[in-house]
Amino acid sequence: MGSLTNNDNLHIFLVCFIGQGVVNPMLRLGKAFASKGLLVTLSAPEIVGTEIRKANNLNDDQPIKVGSGMIRFEFFDDGWESVNGSKPFDVWVYINHLDQTGRQKLPIMLKKHEETGTPVSCLILNPLVPWVADVADSLQIPCATLWVQSCASFSAYYHYHHGLVPFPTESEPEIDVQLPGMPLLKYDEVPDYLHPRTPYPFFGTNILGQFKNLSKNFCILMDTFYELEHEIIDNMCKLCPIKPIGPLFKIPKDPSSNGITGNFMKVDDCKEWLDSRPTSTVVYVSVGSVVYLKQEQVTEMAYGILNSEVSFLWVLRPPSKRIGTEPHVLPEEFWEKAGDRGKVVQWSPQEQVLAHPATVGFLTHCGWNSTQEAISSGVPVITFPQFGDQVTNAKFLVEEFKVGVRLGRGELENRIITRDEVERALREITSGPKAEEVKENALKWKKKAEETVAKGGYSERNLVGFIEEVARKTGTK
């Protein structure tokens, strides 16, 4: 992709929360802007910088050329270690801590850029750092949000925040929810941060903070595509300035971008093993970068995988020192029975795995990144949601996009999925009429995803239109 006329002086500044699931789409967006000829800075707490450097074998934060533009990193000390030392990590305490320190650190960084001749043209934040909009407003810098969930989830949060439709409450926890342009959501299909029984109310509170600041954003960029959620997008466009620009991971890669990713862990080499497997025989199993399953659930999954006799590539993350999780243990006879039809890794290059011809299906937690990557790669799914928007995504994958089969309904079920259920789902997604149906549908979505990010496609036009809007606001065009 080439640069846009007269936009060489535009400087887009992206601000991220910690967490691979939010850093990855921000980095993809940054690369997309840079490939259009813009200067892009990605900023986040230093812990993000530490993990990205380690995973990508980087020695410093030198700018990276992408097309005719540039992307660089500016990580900042959030002061967490000096205040909390070796105390167990508490995400809600950290969110509030970052709110306070970020409001102090960000203006200093922005003013420094102005003094050194690279003033920031636009601030873009993700929903877990709503305070960035306040900083932008105080400095009169145009501000936008990159929404990294579906438009369906955005609609749920918007209608909840404004009290426009009834949602589950403490006294009526099993209310189903009807939102404009959407199928009925059962009480356990609503993003569960909004449910009174959620064990993670702080995430809902934090995300809803973005909706209090929505008027301070001139645009809501969405990592989704119109063809996927057109009715919901049409309805929400009447209420908010939405621009779908996804799927960001499908935007053609510029070879000069070095292949740097937002991964926090080094990926294991899976290609040689996948190359050794026949076409459409391997089920990829991963529950993302945050979900950590109970040992009992891992054991049931292991036996379900063994009993299905399906080939598998299974991501089992190492335990987290920060959170204090224990390592997962596979049954003693697992490898004796699995033989060479399976491989277990600590982390994988997911985009490449899903694009590999050996991959036939994806058992996924249904995070939005994984959801889009599966659909846009033409890979059917087994939905195994846990919390947050995952339960909503699972519904759409199975009932609306028709690319998968359901394995569970999320943590509100409060049960262990059995080995028999796992075996049934694996068999259903790999052979028989259901497998053929979901594969055909997945390939249709893949084609639409490729078309929307190609030159002249709906998402690509929105991306260009956003850049032009920033240029007008800053007087550079």
Curated annotation (Swiss-Prot):
What reaction is this protein's catalytic activity? Answer: apigenin + UDP-alpha-D-glucose = isovitexin + UDP + H(+); luteolin + UDP-alpha-D-glucose = isoorientin + UDP + H(+)
Q: Could you say which residues form the signal peptide? A: none
Any GO MF annotation of the entry: quercetin 7-O-glucosyltransferase activity
Regulation of activity: what does the record state? Inhibited by Hg(2+), Zn(2+), Fe(3+), Co(2+), Cu(2+), Al(3+) and Fe(2+). Slightly enhanced by low concentration of DMSO (below 3 percent), but gradually inhibited by higher concentrations. Requires UDP to be active, but slightly inhibited by UDP in a dose-dependent manner when concentration is higher than 0.32 mM. Activated by sucrose in a dose-dependent manner.
Q: What class of enzyme is it?
A: transferase
According to its UniProt entry, the protein's GO biological process terms are: flavone biosynthetic process; luteolin metabolic process
* pH relationship of activity: Optimum pH is 7.5 (at 50 degrees Celsius).
**EC number(s) on file:** 2.4.1.-
Could you say which residues bind UDP-alpha-D-glucose here?
A: 289, 347-348, 365-373, 387-390
Tissue pattern of expression reads:
Highly expressed in young leaves, with a lower expression in mature leaves. Higher expression at early stages of petals development than at the late stages.
Quote the PROSITE patterns the UniProt record gives: UDPGT
Protein name per Swiss-Prot or TrEMBL: Isovitexin/isoorientin synthase UF6CGT1
Q: Which organism is it from?
A: Gentiana triflora
Taxonomic lineage is: Eukaryota, Viridiplantae, Streptophyta, Embryophyta, Tracheophyta
| Gene transcribed to yield this protein | UF6CGT1
